[in-house]
């Protein structure tokens, strides 16, 4: 199986012109597999030309058979059209993707991805869990300890304190710990940003930030191949490791979940690293269960 018709060497390139055909391919794979093979922000980056793609053109460039996508230094994302599988295309794309990016995501860690990873001597090096629970949530009675008050985020006032605590709380996290002032500004400019759903635990008196819970509402997407209802997310929950007060995570998580329920949402979700045992325990106590496993695979000889 060759990756391209004879005379056209395979090459990574930016592909805003091919974005519509690739979106159709990604939708078809998502509908067949029950999980989107390419994440939302990577799909946006294909459309804007910010990502590089390697396309398996199949029979015609308007109807691509598979794609690997590379964005910045992140693990690549790969999919093959459901009706073009088991023809060696995934193997070629994943091999090229790992050569370029060093790693590849497998959203949902489906049996085909596991089998292909094993055939290519790739091993799981990161497991990101998506956990969910129904809303509303019964009152759990978590109260802030003495000397701590919960208030909501005030744009224009709380950014620097938030970024400081976020960097400390997520010092070892591959993405969240890197958030800076401009990245925060971009998120706050999004339609979904809602300061009333962004809770801060502060000292009282003193108003020193100790911990935060930033919630995010994903609107329903009834159209398309993979329709979903609205979802409320525990987007970022972080406690300053220097705060020295236990229980702030539970207090803030409950407050945010009650807020999402008040907004009429019937499902809450969150993402957590599987090896973050304290966080997984906290979410299990709050009634969350694993909904989906997302795995980063790397060659066995790499760390
Ligand atoms: C994973 C995926 C890319 C494989 O694409 P593909 O073109 O079907 O894969 P290939 O034909 O190159 O398969 C190569 C090897 O992977 C393994 N494999 C692939 N699909 C398999 C399946 N459904 N069951 C068992 N083994 C499978 C086999 O070892 C296969 O070799 P073989 O056909 O000689 O037995 C495709 O199923 C897909 O798009 N899945 C959704 C997105 C995803 O999970 N991406 C992450 C990739 S790590």
UniProtKB/Swiss-Prot annotation:
Sites where the protein binds 1D-myo-inositol 2-(L-cysteinylamino)-2-deoxy-alpha-D-glucopyranoside: 175, 216, 233, 271
Catalytic activity: 1D-myo-inositol 2-(L-cysteinylamino)-2-deoxy-alpha-D-glucopyranoside + acetyl-CoA = mycothiol + CoA + H(+)
Entry keyword DNA-binding: no
Keyword Acyltransferase included in the entry's annotation: yes
Membrane-spanning residues: none
Residue positions binding acetyl-CoA 2: 237-239, 244-250, 276-281
Keywords: Acyltransferase, Repeat, Transferase
Residue span(s) of domain N-acetyltransferase: 148-303
Pfam families, alphabetized: Acetyltransf_1
Binding-site residues for acetyl-CoA 1, renumbered to this chain: 78-80
Listed GO biological process terms: mycothiol biosynthetic process
GO-annotated molecular function: mycothiol synthase activity; protein-N-terminal-alanine acetyltransferase activity
Top EC group: transferase
EC number of the protein: 2.3.1.189
Membership in a protein family: Belongs to the acetyltransferase family. MshD subfamily.
Main function: Catalyzes the transfer of acetyl from acetyl-CoA to desacetylmycothiol (Cys-GlcN-Ins) to form mycothiol.
Subunit structure as annotated in this protein's UniProt entry: Monomer.
Protein name: Mycothiol acetyltransferase
